Amino acid sequence: MDGTGGSDILRAFDTMDLNWKKLHYAFLSHEHTDHFLGMIWVIRTIAELLELEEYEGDFYLYGNDVVLGKVLHVCRMILKKQSQAFLETRIKFVLVKDHERKHILNYDFTFFDIGSTKAKQYGFLMEYDNGKKLVFAGDEPLKENGKKYSKNVDWLLSEAFCLFDEELKFHAYQYQHQTVKEASMIAQDLKVKNLLIWHTEDQTGKKRKERYTEEAKQFYKGNVWVPEDGEVFNM
């Protein structure tokens, strides 16, 4: 789900001992560099494994028409010819539309346009086979098109760029982000069971989890999760 802002994703895979050969599905929400550029490295890595005949099956990247078009354009400009041969053959670009449903990895996904005015961006509802539901809301506050999929879900992955009292410092509103306070109030209104806060500023350091959780619990009665990079937990 998104690719970070660049080659950091390679280090993350290495640090967490993740196997590229087992990665077959990815989703890219939008074109902004902190989400987009790492996906180019993902595609390059998969293409090199394919060239070496060390990757079984195909790789599928899901996204809206705008972001997929730009990924494909960049890949055609900068990847070597041997890698480009796998684009749209073994490396597949799967277009999804607003409210479209797809069955992926034994899960049911419903994709939706988050209504961003900065760049076309999609989120999704993921329904587990045990009935649980997860919503990835994109990196802006939930609007009505996303809220209707988020009522009573088990997990809401919501951006919150900073604490409410530090908005003037980090300018969350200027960039169409929200604070922990707003994210928590929305989650409470939607009766979400678990709120996972991501896409945060990175200056708070080791106290971020504690401080963000403390603010969230003032407005939200469910479980609050503020993961650190590389943290793994059971959803």
What residues fall within each predicted segment?
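Active-site metal-binding motif and surrounding structural segment of the metallo-beta-lactamase
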Residues: 7-60
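Cap/insert and terminal regions of metallo-dependent hydrolase folds
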Residues: 141-230
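Structured loop/turn residues at beta-strand edges in well-structured enzyme cores
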Residues: 18-21, 57, 89, 105, ...
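Active-site neighborhood of phospho(di)ester-bond hydrolases with catalytic His/Asp-centered motifs
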Residues: 1-4, 23-34, 38, 62-64, ...
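P-loop/Walker A phosphate-binding loop and immediately adjacent motor/lid segment at beta-alpha junctions
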Residues: 42-60, 120-127, 168-196
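Acidic/polar short surface loop at catalytic or gating sites that assists cofactor/ion binding
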Residues: 49-92
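Core dinuclear metal-dependent hydrolase active-site scaffold
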Residues: 1-19, 92-148, 229-235
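Short, charged/polar "capping" segments at the starts of alpha-helices
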Residues: 9, 67-72, 203-207, 234
